[in-house]
Amino acid sequence: MMSQQDLPTLFYSGKSNSAVPIISESELQTITAEPWLEISKKGLQLEGLNFDRQGQLFLLDVFEGNIFKINPETKEIKRPFVSHKANPAAIKIHKDGRLFVCYLGDFKSTGGIFAATENGDNLQDIIEDLSTAYCIDDMVFDSKGGFYFTDFRGYSTNPLGGVYYVSPDFRTVTPIIQNISVANGIALSTDEKVLWVTETTANRLHRIALEDDGVTIQPFGATIPYYFTGHEGPDSCCIDSDDNLYVAMYGQGRVLVFNKRGYPIGQILIPGRDEGHMLRSTHPQFIPGTNQLIICSNDIEMGGGSMLYTVNGFAKGHQSFQFQ
């Protein structure tokens, strides 16, 4: 009879030494991001990166509601206002300069969207939390001034979330897809024919081909080209001018890059991820007119701070609605 010492034994080595091992994407082109700017020595749930027409970067922290404004040239950080709504999750900028802020509310039924100036003045409810049951996480404008938003509700076995389109006059809300589990990131292709959506707690990437009206799905047009692995799942996303999609992986300290057909073609790693640091990567965004990508993450779980990281992407960022 073999002793316990003689038995085949598993050892931590190679990928199994990592807190967040990469298995299925290990052969992809892989680069490691460089630190760009420390937002706080405290762990803040950073999200919502977006640049205005003057090249100023706006972002927020979800749990405390701070809205930050950063000058990329000087790296000066300002806090122009604090969200009056609970748990803001994304900022998008209208071509008229207003900030549209998505908020999650109580994470059940009191989310919405409000608009404000860059200083937090002239508040306007766009989607009111009192008259809806949404938990709004993110949005993307089309060239007509309407927008798509994600409903962040549900969980893996109770898919209550979905994606909706709001008309340019903000009066009509049309469902695009429903019954998905925590709809999160959303991006629109350069020709506005394809809508990308990440489904966080089901670890899926949706590719939705749209008719010219922007709300009707083409025959067989709603597909799932990719299933992610690991904890927690895909988060916010953006596109470049070649229609590549950049998806932040929350809880994994990395960004995955897909081509316009949904095939993975590259990945960006956050330093320290193998040791369990800076895993809460939430949002990638391009500096306008460049291929320089900014990524936000934080180290709440390990008692660390909140950082922005940077790399160069495959192509320049797409000039979206606020620049048109």
UniProtKB/Swiss-Prot annotation:
Enzyme Commission code(s) on record: 3.1.1.-
Effect in UniProt of substituting N184S: Loss of activity
Impact when changing E47S: Loss of activity
Outcome, altering D235A: Loss of activity
Mutation effect (E301A): Increase in lactonase activity
Keyword hit for Heme: no
GO molecular function list: hydrolase activity; metal ion binding
Enzyme category, top tier: hydrolase
Active site per the UniProt annotation: D235 (proton donor)
Reported effect, D235N: Loss of activity due to inability to bind calcium ion
One Pfam family, short name: SGL
InterPro entries found in the cross-reference section: 6-blade_b-propeller_TolB-like, SGL, SMP-30/CGR1_Lactonase
Family recorded in the similarity comment: Belongs to the SMP-30/CGR1 family.
Primary role: Exhibits lactonase activity. Acts in cells with perturbed membrane integrity and is possibly related to the membrane homeostasis.
Protein name: Lactonase drp35
Source organism: Staphylococcus aureus (strain Mu50 / ATCC 700699)
